[in-house]
Amino acid sequence: MSELASAPKVALGSIAFAVFWMMAVFPSVPFLPIGRTAGSLLSAVLMVIFHVISPDDAYASIDLPILGLLFATMVVGSYLRNAGMFKHLGRLLAWKSQGGRDLMCRVCVVTALASALFTNDTCCVVLTEFVLELAAERNLPAKPFLLALASSANIGSAATPIGNPQNLVIAFNSKITFPKFLMGILPAMLVGMAVNMVMLLCMYWRELGGGAELSVDGKQMEAVEEGRSPASAKSTPQLNGNGNTMMSLEMSENITTKHPWFMQCTEARRKLFLKSFAYVVTVGMVVAYMVGLNMSWTAITTALALVVVDFRDAEPCLDTVSYSLLVFFSGMFITVSGFNKTGLPGAIWDFMAPYSKVNSVGGISVLSVIILLLSNLASNVPTVLLMGDEVAKAAALISPAAVTTSWLLLAWVSTVAGNLSLLGSAANLIVCEQARRAPRNAYDLTFWQHIVFGVPSTLIVTAVGIPLIGKI
């Protein structure tokens, strides 16, 4: 049983956490329009000032392995964009398209699979404008494709520890290996992706009629290859909390300091070598994850290998890192740790635990509803930080296998919960903002347009995926 701290400590800790929640959900409230990152830091400072957590404990609560993995993943993603990875994904979407329905299915499948490896937010940043172009060329409505992009990115990202930030937290806290995590959620992800795709086709069958294959404009492909980064990075706000935009900038071409071997090669050969190296090293990184090597140091090593072999000033690449996201996470770690020290989360869980056991259908249903609601009220990463250990402790009383199942269930539900509303995940907001600010074929995806599809999709996809969690 969890014991509550003193009444003043509980009250002050709750106030500090309420500030964090308010700024995470409403980052631009009129009376304090400081944004999510500053709001996270403010909450962390309040926890220390109110003596809810000591300064030493506050620093100790910052999870450096997670921050290191986030940082390295952003660097690797930047090099992959410059290597044309997303250009090829764009070509795959457009190649020999048989019409609007076929294109819809491609968007769902390609986005889901790419998000599992390159994070949901990255895929949404790069693919949104290209999807708008494809729809406009074929005289198809943009809304179904934007919904497909956002929802599939969230569903696909659930499959791996590197798909989204909350999965990173779960993987590190649970010590579940990359292969075990992948195989535990992959069946649910594949079925969920298919169900989501069928729902989109059913809801927009008439609108998706037509749209025969058209040739893909080379300039569009070039824009995708460049990640739309120089313009998009300035036109799209940093969206932190349960994701990041990871805007990229093209590597500077005016740096002439090169190894003599490179100077003997043509520029075309040099670029081909660097692109090939980026792909090979990234595959090696995934293989290292699969064999169980330390995820954080594997990603950092991969990032540094790309920096060294590029043999140019790394500052343009490092500038693409969303440092505000890393600061947001640091403040969030301190805030959640302080709130846990009040004993309030533990007391609430003690009340809910008897009804949320993972060895019964009713218990799993109750637990899933709690996770789904909290993920939309408090955001999914704080929900994972608050509930993870408590859920695992309760599952440990059942069996060791139940502990793994509980972590995987938390990963699945908290991620798919992001599809419930436009505010449910950063990926949704990125798609919305990118589409609204697109220089051509802009589209304003509203809250209500999203929720009409988001609510039934989230409930059904979550439900069909839960029985498949941990079955392999």
Swiss-Prot record:
GO CC term (a single one): membrane
Induction data: Regulated by silicon level; the expression being decreased 4-fold by continuous silicon supply for 3 days.
InterPro entries, sorted: Cit_transptr-like_dom
Effect recorded for S115N: In lsi2; impairs silicon uptake. Reduced growth. Grain discoloration. Reduces grain yield 2.5-fold
Location of the protein in the cell: Cell membrane
GO biological process assignments: transmembrane transport
Keyword terms: Cell membrane, Membrane, Transmembrane, Transmembrane helix, Transport
Tissues/organs with expression: Constitutively expressed in roots. Localizes on the plasma membrane of the proximal side of both root exodermis and endodermis, where casparian strips exist (at protein level).
Primary localization: membrane
Topology within the bilayer: Multi-pass membrane protein
Recorded superkingdom: Eukaryota
Membrane-spanning segments: 15-35, 38-58, 60-80, 107-127, 181-201, 272-292, 320-340, 366-386, 394-414, 450-470
Family: Belongs to the arsenite-antimonite (ArsB) efflux (TC 2.A.45) family.
Function: Silicon efflux transporter involved in silicon transport from the root cells to the apoplast. Is coupled with the silicon influx transporter NIP2-1/LSI1 in both exodermal and endodermal root cells for an efficient silicon transport across the cells into the stele. Silicon is beneficial to plant growth and helps plants to overcome abiotic and biotic stresses by preventing lodging (falling over) and increasing resistance to pests and diseases, as well as other stresses.
Protein known as: Silicon efflux transporter LSI2
Organism, scientific name: Oryza sativa subsp. japonica (Rice)
